[in-house]
Amino acid sequence: MNEPIIIKSKETINGVKIRYLKDGEYFFKNLGFHNYFYIKTSDFIPNENDFMYQYHNYVAKTSDINGFTKIEFNNNFKRYFARLFWEKRCKTYEADMRAHKRFLMDSNFPLHNEEIPYLFFDIETDDRKNLRKDDRGNVLPHKDARILSCAMVDYKGNEFYYELKEDNAESEIILLQQILSLFSKYGIISAWNSKKFDMPYIKNRLDLFHINYDILDYVNHLDYMELFKKYDNKSRKSFSLNAISNEVLHESKIDQEKGNGKIYETWKNDKEQLKRYNIQDSKLILKINLQRAFIEVSCLRANNAHCHVVDTVQNSHSGDYLLLREYKNQGIIMPSEPLKDEILERRKKGKIGGGHTTCKKPGFWKNVKIWDFKSEYPSVITTFNISHETYVGTIYDENNIKEYLTDEYVVTPPDYEKKYHPARVYRKTKKGVIPIVVDFLVNERDKIKYRMKIHQHELNKDGTKNINYNPDLYKKEYLEQYAFKTDGNSIYGAIADACSRYYDWEIADSITTSARATLKYCYKDLEALGCLVLGGDTDSTFTIIKEGYTVQEIDDRFVKILQEWTDHWHSNNNKLVFEFEKEFDTMLFCKKKNYGYKNLNGEIHIVGLEAKKSSTNSLAAKIQLEYVEQVLNEKYDPVYWENKVEELHDLIFDQKMNAEELTLVLGLNKLAKDYAGYVIDKKTNLPKIKKDGTIQKKSIPGHVKLAERLIKDGHSIDVGQKMHYIVIHDKPILAITPEEFSLGTGEFPYVDKKKNDITFYFEGDYDSKYYWKRLLAPLIKVAYFYHGGLPEWNWNVTAGELKKLVKEKDEVSD
């Protein structure tokens, strides 16, 4: 008989309720379990009488454990209130956990998350009404905006489709019950942007009709768009399902107009079209997962941490399971996760030092070699035995470092990055808990990677057939090692997160400081060899190696110098590996985290440049990308580009840009009222004074002004929403919607430079000067760094404007 597959669990008043799958059937099981937390006994004794007077009916028992009092509850729902009682009097320990989390933490039975059946879904809704959003950005559908259809495809490719039969409550209730019934047959459900749209929409409609959906508490919901962003970890102009499907699958969504009742009209008049459109969306998500397998990665990570799949969405949650379990094994009781006031207090300490990213040598380069730290932060943690219980203190005076370079201690190197980050001291006589966890994750990953090499290639290096070649096993092993890698890299985040029980500013800063100092040490050694270090990105370096050296020689050298480096700081467990990773055929380096490169396969990649940003208008992005591609392909033609600038100028000033090229997109981070106040001078930290002697007020961006006008006109606009707009006048800026622009004429309220309220008469023109500068800014950035200065083309701006554009080349951002 197969072991049960644990789907999800939930706290009950006197235990835990578990949903599990066994032999193809779902079951629930109620288990008795008393939740508990700890108080230092020295704090418990003087407050015991008051506490027991209020909570004696809910406390099962108390017991003393190594200076702590363990309080067990016979009513798990009183744990939160009991915590508040103690928080007013003293520090609590592990008092934040609900019973189901504590139960998983205390147990060791296998969960088998990798065997959970999963389902992809997509809903279509009545789009005749404007959508509203709550403070968290979740959709709030209008009470009359029904769900029209729901398409679902499971992990085996089975398709399901339910539709609204009639536009009435009875039909929608049936549809909702069908959706809920199918959801209940799976352990994981996922859709694209479902955290903000599909799931809150469905729950809102269920609430409206008073339909019980407790079953969803026992189903893991994963937003696949969030998974894609998390695990793919690349910047893109758009994360729409259509954009990602085109990129990953070279497939598109089925054409279908949306908004202003278009979906509703299709439901009324062409139900087959709506069905095709709806099902295709779910099938696209399935196909993306077949390639990327992010559901499977999430399941494997849940196994690593012994938690539910939904707990892997946030690294801090799965990381808590990983770390707290080992602290428990070591007999160490940890603090509770902080409450709001403590989080705010922690954040006052300021930002923890970040990674070392630099651009030392901007320009165009060929044959660029990249060296990269293997698991940089995990390796630093293990090398310097960084953990809460091993931390001794901080050394602010470097003259005092020597006294700690002994057999008992290891010292982390200091570093200067905008400000001084001091050395820290850790005991090395006993391995820390965090290094134990990190070592386990890294070592397990290394074992799998070794096996992967055996199964990866069909042919051996000598051309003979590889009898161990197994692409299916290779993919399985790849997912397993990727899960371990993600978990290993997430540990630092738990220490640096102000909301975490593991947060410690000194410890987190010692990790990033050690990493920066070590990377800079490697830079210096490369430069001492005569290599040209162009710059780097957190854990890597872009280098032109000196003629006469080989990659292997430099790899061997790094083994030697990193051992010397860690010996100097008295580490007895060096795990630092700085090794050759890859080579760029060509590279255009503009500034840190802003570059383009062509790999040895001829593929071009863009990092950080405006061509990849959603806020860049499409024409500017297209032009910058074309320029970079010409440069990287070594087909750059300066005459072509000099003429191109003239052509673009004529295109823009002849009013020939189309609405798509004109449309700008920016997120609405705050409303107009939040822009009140004055511009602060960075040098004086006082309000900036204009030439006429008046104080310079903060200007309100065009998309914010547009949002304010639309709200006044009765439109539903929420903070966090993406605003699509076209600028028809600048200084002061006036923006309208693409739909308003397409009408060709219009009258809009406007406040001119003299603060007069006037009516602006729109006659179909956009502001040519505004768009010209927006197009030039990204182009000037790449042209400037390729040429080592700005080419003397006719840029069609004044000398002052050109000077400003060149000055802002390092800050170009739409």
List each model region and its residues.
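Active-site palm subdomain of RNA-directed nucleic acid polymerases
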Residues: 253, 518-538, 543
